[in-house]
Amino acid sequence: MTDAQQSRKPRIALMGEFSAGKSTLSNLLLGGRALPEKVTATRLAPVWMSYGTTPPYRVTLDGGTEPVSLDRLESVPVAETRVIRLFMECDILELCDLIDFPGISDPNMSSDVWERMLPEVDAVLWCTHATQAWRQSEAAVWAMMPDALRDFSILLITRYDKLISDKDRRRVFQRVRLETEGQFAATFPISLLQALQAGDDYDKWDASGAGPFVTHLVDMIDKLTKVAARTDQPLYNIANGTAIPEPVRATIMPRRVQRLRDAAQTDADDTDDPVRASL
């Protein structure tokens, strides 16, 4: 086993339609904003975030690199950029890399902008807006994904609080689960804004739907880390019917992430909500 293989972290993409909550999800996972407030991720090439203090740069289509300024990211030429690389010191990036993709159906952006980054991905956190969940355009893109990637991916029904009645929530959740059966490792309804606003209030955190999601996410990253220790090939590149390397080692999680996982698991075990209890 090479040093490169030992050190490779899982690479998890944040994907979905425009305004489905990807930026809010990124802020939630990172514990803060990765981009300046005036910068809109939907207007950028994919943004690959890793742990560290390296200055930001962009990777050109021919593999070259050029430094970029965080305050001027929107001036980076999207059509000529494969990916923007950002580095931060935060807990989640000690466990994995995050790649924030632009919206999949932006009429002002060619799908080539995000499709060329798919070979770098091990798993996806897919955000679908609760009021128009799992549109045909989303299903069409997801049909491109190989089983190896799907087996570790999570579907988030975002802005779940916008569904007013319990009946509507159950109807949407059941429909999405039926239409995506076998295509994701797990599906969670969630209000990302409520989760962000919860702070250290674990009751509000759990009520937002974030508790069960985070518990599953950390477990999923643990499994992906063991797979990444055996192969430098991201799971998007593993064809259907091809065996995924067996896990070989455990993940050492930062204590803060472990505490968050334990607290989320305790709250999830105590819930009486039949929809969330079924997750």
What are the functions of these language-model segments?
Residues 72-96, 106, 112-186:
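Conserved C-terminal guanine-recognition region of P-loop GTPase G domains, centered on the G4
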Residues 1-97:
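Conserved G1/Walker A P-loop phosphate-binding module
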Residues 161-226:
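Canonical P-loop GTPase G-domain recognition
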Residues 1-15, 39, 52, 74, ...:
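Extended helical scaffolds that flank P-loop GTPase cores
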Residues 17, 51, 129, 158, ...:
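Cofactor-binding loop segments of dinucleotide-utilizing enzymes, especially the Rossmann-like FAD-
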Residues 22, 100, 161:
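Acidic active-site catalytic centers that drive phospho-/nucleotidyl reactions
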